[in-house]
Amino acid sequence: AYRPVANDRLNALASYTWLYDMPGADQVNVDGNVNGPKQRSHILNAALSYDLNQQFTLGAKYGFRLREEAARGTNTFITSTAHLAILRLDYHIVHNWDILAEGRAMAYPKADTTEFGALLGVYRDLNDNVRLGAGYSWGGVSDDLRSLERDREGLFVNLIGKF
């Protein structure tokens, strides 16, 4: 993480996840499915945000997933990759209120497929550590590379804690 105290105009965060989701009989996978597939995944993420001025913040995220997936009850794994790109703009309206717009693209090179999505939301800072938001998501592209399912489109409510 790069989050300077003296000048936090630019913030960066990178992460690596090793997901070993090999549920046995009657156990759920990461998506909560009893009969869903099992997976082994390496996931890399990098996110940046930059304050253009006091009202606008530009954000970007890139994610990469290398996954091995098999149907429940088999050990025949299929390897695939995915690339996630997100571009986001936050607008600080007035004290404690923000609007955000986000565009998303998820590319699956092996399948020669790219999916697109968008998100609009309104957020309210309840205090220094809690933010509540609501909005609408189009296109079904999730920012969670652990998931094996498409994200659902529609309304969402989001509660964020920051420390």
What is each stretch, according to the model?
Residues 1-163:
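Gram-negative and organellar
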